[in-house]
Amino acid sequence: MKTKDLLFAIIPLVMAGCGLFKSADNLYKEAEIKRNGGEVQAALELLQRIVNQHTDHKKAPEAQYLIAEIYYRDMRDYSEAIKQYDKVKNNFPDSKQVPFSLFMQGFIFANMLADFKQAEIHYSKFIKKYPDHELYQSVEFELKYLGKEIKDIPALKHITS
């Protein structure tokens, strides 16, 4: 075998060993393991690889959504979470994560940032666009009691007692 042929046979094996050819599914699983182990930055990097390298894969919108969730839940970086949820809506407009992203943006604006105007905008978009969605009633509830204290919401009064 010629040296050139040998190199062409070895290079893909070396690259695969380095993780350059990992599937989107494997990267996603690895990201979940990293996140659950508290390595959120490593998880974000793996998820970003899915979004960048496997754009058309079914895991790409899930990866983008999980990036947003990590910023919201793990890092409590609400502004960045809102931006990442926007990427779900803009880059994967037909994915099932879009309504959840819109809901989460409204939720963050209302409950974390106390920006009730933006919350109302996002929740109203949800109501118009997704009248049959499983979160529809939750959005109606959020809109109805937007800006109110828990003690002022009859259905939740028992929580503060």
Question: Language-model segments: what does each one mean?
Answer:
Residues 6, 14-161:
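Acidic, polar-rich low-complexity tracts and alpha-helical solenoid repeat scaffolds
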